[in-house]
Amino acid sequence: METKDLIVIGGGINGAGIAADAAGRGLSVLMLEAQDLACATSSASSKLIHGGLRYLEHYEFRLVSEALAEREVLLKMAPHIAFPMRFRLPHRPHLRPAWMIRIGLFMYDHLGKRTSLPGSTGLRFGANSVLKPEIKRGFEYSDCWVDDARLVLANAQMVVRKGGEVLTRTRATSARRENGLWIVEAEDIDTGKKYSWQARGLVNATGPWVKQFFDDGMHLPSPYGIRLIKGSHIVVPRVHTQKQAYILQNEDKRIVFVIPWMDEFSIIGTTDVEYKGDPKAVKIEESEINYLLNVYNTHFKKQLSRDDIVWTYSGVRPLCDDESDSPQAITRDYTLDIHDENGKAPLLSVFGGKLTTYRKLAEHALEKLTPYYQGIGPAWTKESVLPGGAIEGDRDDYAARLRRRYPFLTESLARHYARTYGSNSELLLGNAGTVSDLGEDFGHEFYEAELKYLVDHEWVRRADDALWRRTKQGMWLNADQQSRVSQWLVEYTQQRLSLAS
């Protein structure tokens, strides 16, 4: 039986971040994901790298300070999929007085180490404003946007770059301690093939399933309860042409974002609803749709109805149960629990956490694991660049360089490659000299060469992996085009299997 230094169960942002950090410190690492990378909470976020302005109201200064500092780090680590964005906050005096917002924004500007992002300012909305005429004043501040699912993917690629192993569609079925080691058993969810490994340490980063894996996978008591809080978003055709996002205050003291997305759409979200069901079956409720439309329509001149919605997505945040009364008051901070057996076979479990602070969470996890590994390397991720991030400049400059090297690329395709694959675009394009070298076009300039790259280098096995997580081509491809992608994947997988045998 093969022995690993560390097995990480869960292929969301926290699992991938911990696995990448550990592999880079010289540990032999295996990451197991039961379905697809980022298939649950990590692809259902608001897609922001943000300090969390509203968390200041709950006195979460440590969390906000850490998150603010991380924005600058992540912009450097993944400049192809993360970029700065300005946020406009319409002032509604009966909800929060201007002095309170000014204090909050002053703290937001100064709590974290801000080197590249501009500070906050006051605003007056004139006649040309997209907001209703009664909204005359507001504020503007900086945060960042990120492609959440691709941030997970880049970390998984880093695991492999640093010598680790990543298996998707491989479900960990049990883990037990034996003679100072973990015995981990898993099965391939497609073929039923069984695997087992030994490991010196184990990480439970299963997100919404963290407590369930304690109960069913390890038959151990979970050190903390978990509260599942559902967050849903609606997507509509772009509601305005400005680059800025809007952060809207609502009567219930919650906030809702309106975020420009992929040049053609706006994301509106999120909700905060206690959730008791199966995390895999999570979907938006009618009441959430009405809530989000109502908050939006209260603020904007351009009104929206249900018919404008082109897509919705929902996810559950697995938050550590701190017995708060309301979903929005529960801490978004993370809790790491570690325990061992006679100084060996540590189990580190992740409760809670945010996309923005995943790298610090991973660093803290490795601090807790370090005493169990002789000769483990030091922290290293703060100065690293994730796979695809070596674009030397900004994304649009890189897209222009791609077009010079591959003159047959349209502007839109070069931009898509630059903003999706970054410096890995050249691996995708290889020696292509004409557009016909890219193979079949499945629709919306989604060519065979891209899909082949996704299978060979990004763990894509099913159409959803390619169309809704590695890319968002599902927003444009119709049902027939999507089923052609599925068919191609089956044929290509069979071809690879016959070559391998």
UniProtKB/Swiss-Prot annotation:
Pathway: Polyol metabolism; glycerol degradation via glycerol kinase pathway; glycerone phosphate from sn-glycerol 3-phosphate (aerobic route): step 1/1. GO terms for molecular function: electron transfer activity; FAD binding; glycerol-3-phosphate dehydrogenase (quinone) activity; protein homodimerization activity. FAD binds at residues 5-33. InterPro entries: DAO_C (IPR031656), DAO_C_sf (IPR038299), FAD-dep_OxRdtase (IPR006076), FAD/NAD-bd_sf (IPR036188), G3P_DH_FAD-dep (IPR000447). It is an enzyme of class 1 (oxidoreductase). PROSITE patterns: FAD_G3PDH_1, FAD_G3PDH_2. Transmembrane segments: none annotated. GO terms for biological process: aerobic respiration; anaerobic respiration; glycerol catabolic process; glycerol-3-phosphate catabolic process. Belongs to the FAD-dependent glycerol-3-phosphate dehydrogenase family. This is Aerobic glycerol-3-phosphate dehydrogenase. The lineage of its organism: Bacteria, Pseudomonadati, Pseudomonadota, Gammaproteobacteria, Enterobacterales. The gene is glpD.
